[in-house]
Amino acid sequence: MDFAKLLVASPEVNPNNRKALTIPVLNPFNTYGRVFFFSWFGFMLAFLSWYAFPPLLTVTIRDDLDMSQTQIANSNIIALLATLLVRLICGPLCDRFGPRLVFIGLLLVGSIPTAMAGLVTSPQGLIALRFFIGILGGTFVPCQVWCTGFFDKSIVGTANSLAAGLGNAGGGITYFVMPAIFDSLIRDQGLPAHKAWRVAYIVPFILIVAAALGMLFTCDDTPTGKWSERHIWMKEDTQTASKGNIVDLSSGAQSSRPSGPPSIIAYAIPDVEKKGTETPLEPQSQAIGQFDAFRANAVASPSRKEAFNVIFSLATMAVAVPYACSFGSELAINSILGDYYDKNFPYMGQTQTGKWAAMFGFLNIVCRPAGGFLADFLYRKTNTPWAKKLLLSFLGVVMGAFMIAMGFSDPKSEATMFGLTAGLAFFLESCNGAIFSLVPHVHPYANGIVSGMVGGFGNLGGIIFAIIFRYSHHDYARGIWILGVISMAVFISVSWVRPVPKSQMRE
């Protein structure tokens, strides 16, 4: 099918798990397209609000509240700390209640402190407010778990990375949106600066609530309906299959069931691909195969012991710790990049350096999906998660090399600085996408816990690296090469860890 048509056509669906095999990016009228849209759009608005303070904090809010540089740094760290805690909690909540309801809950709860920004009158009040607004950063977890539930493993890396990349771009968009709203309120409404910045935060509040209501009334929990009934479909479909009314996996004949997702296509069984012949299966054998395939990917509500084993398994740590380096570096560098540019190129001015710094976040639109796309491409060619693992290791090592080069050279040339930053952005953000392409393979029955753990480690890395920058005394180049050394060492040290535990079901 033509690529342009894939973006708008109803997706083909795997009959074993009802997950889409393509991403209808431009088709919000389709169930899968609508879920994908709200996944990235809701996360983008959350990210926009989460990062809405730095663009106005540099001058306006700082002067109005008489904040010191230390208090500004503390507010940045506190915002990351809140998100770390929320992401760790969100994982089990997604497995228990489903990602859609968790997503909606986080948006609505996080919108309240966003609307209360106008009540802040002191630095301490702003720090406390940013802690609660940090709740919105936790929406990353349900965003990824929701996408994983609707898109097949052959395409889930692209879906997850594209949703996250578009969402992360909110961190760059806010550098343009919030100053534009602020300037408009002063110019067109005649508000003084100390009132205009407070009123400006009503806009993200309205957008966040609208997105949450859209999810609530127009989207489904899973491809088969309610989250609480996700296992019922598996049992009913298996019973139906045992009677012969199933999708014929070898011939592509469609089920006689009157309802179901559109465009369901058949999956070729491995023997067909290897031998070039089709081997009909007995209905009972097909039923068992479908049951095993669905059960292996169905998210359960793990017991406390099972959750503990998942969290501290080597396979989980092998994706969580690298994400602490890649996404943690992104968060930390985002917070200092404008100041770093201003330090090395003072003649550019605050506005111009801020716009160039925003481009680091904007590149997520292309770079993060690129990592997921490459990982999916290699997986389809090799049919082994090791392909994704090797790609991840390569991206992580090169990412570290770029940070080391940038830190030791401390460029004074605009071309060199922006070139190294763009190269770093590609490998760093592609690395983020590749990691969440691999996450669905690790303990798929506890995908929420794994996603929450990995997402939480990303914020933990951001906090640690932000502290490194804070105590580097504005020697940003030194802080960047330290991040590069740490990242390279981590990616090399976990490169040997199996991407999927031996005890896990077939891959």
Swiss-Prot record:
Keywords, sorted A to Z: Membrane, Nitrate assimilation, Transmembrane, Transmembrane helix, Transport
Cytoplasmic compartment residues: 1-34, 93-100, 152-161, 220-306, 379-389, 439-507
Membrane topology: Multi-pass membrane protein
GO cellular component: membrane
SUPFAM superfamilies: MFS general substrate transporter
Main localization category: membrane
The UniProt record lists the keyword Transmembrane: yes
Induction per the UniProt record: Subject to nitrate and nitrite induction, and nitrogen metabolite repression. CrnA expression is mediated by the products of nirA, areA, and niaD.
Biological process, per Gene Ontology: nitrate assimilation; nitrate transmembrane transport; nitrite transport
Side of membrane Extracellular, spans: 56-71, 122-130, 183-198, 328-357, 411-417
Coiled coil ranges: none
One Gene Ontology MF term: nitrate transmembrane transporter activity
Membrane-traversing stretches: 35-55, 72-92, 101-121, 131-151, 162-182, 199-219, 307-327, 358-378, 390-410, 418-438
Compartment(s): Membrane
A Pfam family it matches: MFS_1
Matching InterPro entries: MFS, MFS_dom, MFS_trans_sf, NO3_transporter, NO3_transporter_NarK/NarU-like
Function (record text): Permease for nitrate uptake.
Family listed: Belongs to the major facilitator superfamily. Nitrate/nitrite porter (TC 2.A.1.8) family.
Protein name as it appears in the record: Nitrate transporter
Organism: Emericella nidulans (strain FGSC A4 / ATCC 38163 / CBS 112.46 / NRRL 194 / M139) (Aspergillus nidulans)
Name of the gene encoding the protein in the UniProt record: crnA
